[in-house]
Amino acid sequence: MKIIILLGLIGATSSAPLITQRLLSASNSHELLLNLNNGQLLPLQFQSAFNSWIPPFPGLLQQQQQQAQVSGHPQFPLSTLESFAGLFPNQIPFSRQVGFAQGGQAGQPDFSQQQTPSQTQQASPMSYVVPVKVPQDQTQMFQYYPVYMLLPWEQPQQTVTSSPQQTGQQLYEEQIPFYNQFGFVPQQAEPGVPGGQQHLVLDSFVGTAPETPGMPAVEGPLYPQKEPIGFKQDNVGVSTPSTSPKPDTGNFFTSEINPTIAPLLPEQKVNADSLREP
């Protein structure tokens, strides 16, 4: 119905007698209005290739004006009109209607006029292909889906980066106290020995160096040694509470230079090596 209404509006606008010369149109209403004064009905002519949808060519208009002024009945050869009709593939179904319309005579204009609108209605949906853009839009939409499907790839990175952080923190807790106090990393206690890690934590508070770091925990003193050694030389005159059962605070109030540090450090190394050989 919309197509029929549009065709009616276009035919009404194009049939207005604004120009005195005869012009080709998609319907026969324009020619009928121009020839009402003469009282004659002309046979249908080739009017499909040059309708209101297609802009007219300037060269054809000049030829049409000359022929209209000379004879009043313009006639185009079929060969030239078919060549021009081939340039417009959307108007091919209209060119087939012309062969039937040319068979009409001057005495039968109403019969041909009733058939041409029905044929134009059947051919109009064939000439215009509207749903061509639908598959293109669907293909474009499918191209965007992989972008959103790749979003969860951030999760495996979090699991990968979190695993070395745990190992780094464990190594940091085990090795840092020995770097600050002794300046070197001694061999740590085996993980299977019970109480080995507890001795390492207590040494950081007391400040004493054990002779055998792999010794298991027994009742009594934790590390039987001759003399405790204090390594905190910077904090002179400051006493800190210790967690050992028998605290010894004799070496905390010493002078800035402790002469017992230098000779005792190599002795600890010799005693540790002699105990590990057998």
UniProtKB/Swiss-Prot annotation:
Protein name: Odontogenic ameloblast-associated protein
Compartments in which it is found: Secreted; Cytoplasm; Nucleus
Function: Tooth-associated epithelia protein that probably plays a role in odontogenesis, the complex process that results in the initiation and generation of the tooth. May be incorporated in the enamel matrix at the end of mineralization process. Involved in the induction of RHOA activity via interaction with ARHGEF and expression of downstream factors such as ROCK. Plays a role in attachment of the junctional epithelium to the tooth surface.
GO cellular component annotations of the record: cell periphery; cytoplasm; extracellular region; extracellular space; nucleus; supramolecular fiber
One annotated GO biological process: odontogenesis
The UniProt record lists the keyword Secreted: yes
Keyword annotations from UniProtKB, A to Z: Biomineralization, Cytoplasm, Glycoprotein, Nucleus, Secreted, Signal
Compositional bias (Polar residues): 236-258
Subunit structure: Interacts (via C-terminus) with ARHGEF5.
Signal peptide coordinates: 1-15
Residue ranges of the region described as Interaction with ARHGEF5: 126-128
Record note on modification: O-glycosylated.
Homology family: Belongs to the ODAM family.
Species of provenance: Rattus norvegicus
